[in-house]
Amino acid sequence: MNTIKVRDIEIGAGAPKIIVPIVGVTKDDIIAEAKTFDSTPVDMVEWRVDWFENVFEFDKVEEVLKELRDALGNIPILMTFRTSKEGGEKAIEPEAYARLNVKAAQTGYVDFVDVEIFTGDEIVKKIIDGVHAAGARVIASNHDFFKTPAQSDIVYRLRKMQDMGADIPKIAVMPQNKRDVLTLLSATEEMVTDYADRPIITMSMAGTGVISRLCGEVFGSSMTFGAAKKASAPGQMGVNDLSTVLDLLHKAM
């Protein structure tokens, strides 16, 4: 499997890298939180732009991106508009979604954008090609907040993301029981062992699935999400506790 080097981190090598989300509503809240990350074990910051009150005014989005880049120094930025159909704050038309993501990449301030893989193949390809042309990378994603699909279906979705040209495929699913967590972990191992030529991100959500956020180095998930302030999904641990556990597991391997 190939690793991905972005700024000062290498994704896919060593312990899973920690992504910390920012879910502020106002520009002041967003930038204030970003300025607290000096003392936080964060490898990448995800700006959940769907929470931003002015998300549909691109000049204001660009202002925040510029100030985020200044505040975060060399920490990579992932910009994510999580749509309401996949658990996000707002709905958006596919063409507007494409424009937002490509224009964000063209600013030069973001390192990754998140693209929901089931937005429609034509739109997804347009975004991936546009983001790559701008010199940024893509995390393709899929979220099921209600269930855990069959192992074969999880692997199919991750392979589709890879085949579409995403730099990092990502899937998050909701367990109904402990066996569902095993299904997610088994799918992760299968994908990494048999199909993946790039890093992937997988997780089982909520308290039942929290182990999946910790054992990525064992099963093959290269990044994990931790909360510095407000969690953006069920089951996210505090970033300091998460970092401690990841370090302990890494030293034992």
Spans of model-derived segments:
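Short, Lys/Arg-enriched, disordered terminal segments
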Residues: M1-E10, K251-M253
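Short amphipathic alpha-helical surface micro-motifs
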Residues: M1-K5, K60-V61, T183-L184, A206-G207
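Active-site beta->alpha loop and helix N-cap motifs at the rims of alpha/beta catalytic domains
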Residues: N2-I4, A13-A133, H143-K147
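Short N-terminal signal/transit or membrane-insertion segments
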Residues: V6-I9, L68, A96, Q151-Q162
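Solvent-exposed alpha-helices and their adjacent loops that cap or buttress functional pockets
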Residues: I9-A13, D70, A105-T107, Q162-D163, ...
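Catalytic alpha/beta core domains of metabolic enzymes, predominantly
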Residues: F112, I117-M253
